[in-house]
Amino acid sequence: MVKQRKKGSRKRRGGKGSYAHRARARRINASTEFETCSEQLSPFGGLLALIKFFDLVGFREIFHFAYQAPCRQPKLGHYSMMAGILMLLFIGFNRIWHFVYVRLDAMLCGFFRVSRLPAASTYWRYLDSLGINQATSVLKLADMLRERVWQLCGLQYARIRINIDTTVKTVFGNQQGARKGHNTQHRGKLGLRPLLGFIEETREYLVGKLRKGVTVSGQEAAAFIADIQNHLPGCVREVLLRADGEFLSWESVQAALAAGFDFIIANRGCTPVFDPGSWYRPWRRRAVEFNSCFYRPGGWDHACRFVAMRIAKEQKPPSTQPHQCVLFEDDKYTYRIFCTNVAGAAHHIIVEYDKRADVENLVGEAKREGLDMIPSVKFKNNYAFFQIVMLAYNIWRYMKMLAQKSVSAAQKRSAS
């Protein structure tokens, strides 16, 4: 029996090679083909607003006053080199070699008054000349910029809350300062451990630094807390520090008390003893109890206040099979303990600490801004690049604050 095959029913094999109308790449990585880009950036895509922001706050004057220039003398000047890196980060490119995509852009070239931007290697060599001194000066520049923006926005916070947290940046290769430490995503890999502090009210970066990939010691935490006072705006009179258990030590508590800060720090390693008869339940429908006590851990000079929250564990329904009963009452609960010098009910203090959870979102935004990118093998270059990235992050925050202020003012005028 002969079967006739329908015309066009045979499967055709896909040809090898490149297609003329291949879809554009959605991500830029090491294998992406690149050349000089012929497309232009939209003036309404954020870059024009950034240029106007520089003019509004007088960024050039602040830069020349606060920035400590390195020994390398670029042809365009230190301000143009730093502004170019900030613009690259603001656009969304977070690697120095991404300058090849915007080298001929009319808006960037017009801002710097050149026919084309320098090669990407020029910016990399300039970054290679930066070090710890330049990072400190960039942080000072950020402090002056904060004062200027707060003045423009009419912000006068007498009390602020500062959230302190660390993150992990996994590195690949022989990077200076990389260590094996707490890294949940890439266990056993080398990494760096940046330390960051954010202001809760404005969600901006206040102070931080790039660190080796090891746990924060008590002396380092104390030095970091003592340095916060040097970066506070002039209107601030009271500060509440909130940190996780990595920062709990007598050195850090002593530094916070010496600076006059209120603090709520999660417990790590301390075993305070609470009065069994002092547990109270502020909400009847929630199986949550609170307590507080004064306790002096070993090695501490005096006692501090500890507040606790215990949550009843889920009990399995009784079965016909014999089961092991719980020997101690503490095994029936999950405990959350904090060290603080704040007065008030224990549940109010823990509710205040729980508002710190938003710092994880801020750290994630900073990492997407470019904090995850390590441009050099040298630690001093990466240390300076860390502060530049966080300065770009703050500029993005300030532009949103100014835009919100202008929108609110326009709504008030229309309502009146």
Language-model region placement:
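Short, surface-exposed basic-aromatic patches at helix termini and helix-loop junctions that form
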Residues: V253-D262
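Structural motif
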Residues: L41, C71-S80, Q185, F328, ...
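Dynamic "connector" segments at or just before major functional cores
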Residues: V2-K189, P194-V214, A221-G234, A259, ...
